[in-house]
Every structure is written in C-alpha cells, then in structure tokens.
Amino acid sequence: MIDIIVKEDKRLITVQTPEGDEVFYTLSFSDGHKILKRSSARLRNNIYAIGVANIRWMLVDMDNMILSEYIHHVDILKDIDRKMREMGYIVISEWQHANKKGTRR
C-alpha cells in the first residue's frame, strides 16, 4: 500500500507521497461525515490530473489534453483514494457531488 502524508487545512486536503505526488481534495461535512471531493493532482514527472465527470481521475497536460500514455498514473490516484477511505473519509467526484444536489456542473 502507498505511504501518504495528509495535511488538513480548513476546506483543503493535501495528500503527499514520498515519490513527490500531490493530490488535492476539497473538504465538506455532511451528517458528521468528512466528504472529500476530488479536485486536482500534480504527479511525479509533472503529470497533472483533474477529477471530472463520473471518471475518477483524468490525466491532462497544460492544455487539458488527455495523456493516455501515462494512464498507469491513475493507479497511484486510485491507491490514494482507497487510502483516504480507509482513514474514514468519503471520496466523491465533482459529478457525484453535483448530482446529489440535483444539477450537473
């Protein structure tokens, strides 16, 4: 399992790995639960990811083009999501968050 360092600062959660990955979530509370909404990530080798639609994470370059050749980096993000769930957080996507409110963003 992946080693992570979690920093909680009001509504922003920053997760770092020893390999240099940084994952950002926004934090909200609902019925006593800590809800994390996937925001963005800056991974090793300057690969970026965003949490979009009903896809867990999408890798992008600076022009928001999908980087399919680096798709294995998504496994890192899935591992971090899984670890955050083990720590008691509920991880959702932007799409799930918007859909709960009855609208899509």
UniProtKB/Swiss-Prot annotation:
Origin, by domain of life? Viruses
Keyword line? Early protein
Q: Which family does it belong to?
A: Belongs to the phi29likevirus gp16.8 family.
Protein name from the UniProt record: Gene product 16.8
Q: What organism does the UniProt record list as the source?
A: Bacillus phage phi29 (Bacteriophage phi-29)
